[in-house]
């Protein structure tokens, strides 16, 4: 991981009530974007973007070094999921990034004023800088809607081998709902 390197690839698959869309960004000399969508206006689109930080990659950057050069970023490509669900143009948008320490946590805020959108990521202030929660707020027509998530438990396991019903009790230890309940 070099100081100036970016994620090699980011993808998003979004299913809406009336169709689905898939988006992929490949990091080459420029960012190569491919969009495949159910919607005619955005179906099978390809575009090139100048190198820019992607919100999809900041989650990893925060885990590696939360006090990196992230705070110097002035424009960023919002999450691919957000762009698809809100039908926004794929480009880097102005962003104000701030960090503050609260007890043993670090809260990083990404404020996209031109999009009326804010993302807050709360993580441990010490290594391994685990992400504890996040919150996304979007204002539309004067109403703010907030989505949030909080880690309840964690476990290290070979999850790719634990995909049979006999492993369902592991969901309890992670405080996840059981299937069919």
Residue spans of the language-model regions?
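Acidic, serine/threonine-rich low-complexity disordered tracts
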Residues: 1-30, 68-181
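Surface-exposed beta-loop interaction hotspot
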Residues: 25-73
């Amino acid at each position: 991981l070099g100081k100036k390197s970016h994620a090699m690839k980011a993808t998003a698959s979004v299913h809406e009530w009336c169709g689905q869309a898939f988006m992929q960004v490949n990091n080459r000399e420029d960012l190569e974007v491919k969009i495949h969508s159910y919607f005619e206006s955005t179906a099978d689109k390809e575009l090139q973007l100048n190198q820019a930080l992607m919100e999809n990659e900041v989650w990893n950057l925060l885990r590696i070094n939360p006090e990196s050069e992230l705070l110097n970023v002035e424009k960023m490509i919002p999450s691919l999921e957000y762009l698809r669900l809100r039908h926004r143009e794929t480009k880097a948008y102005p962003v104000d990034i701030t960090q503050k320490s609260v007890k043993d946590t670090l809260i990083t805020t990404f404020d996209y004023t031109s999009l009326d959108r804010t993302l807050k990521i709360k993580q441990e202030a010490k290594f391994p800088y685990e992400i504890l929660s996040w919150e996304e707020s979007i204002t539309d027509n004067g109403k703010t809607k907030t989505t949030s998530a909080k880690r309840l438990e964690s476990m290290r396991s070979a999850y790719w081998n634990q995909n049979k019903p006999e492993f369902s009790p592991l969901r309890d230890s992670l405080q996840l709902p059981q299937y069919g309940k």
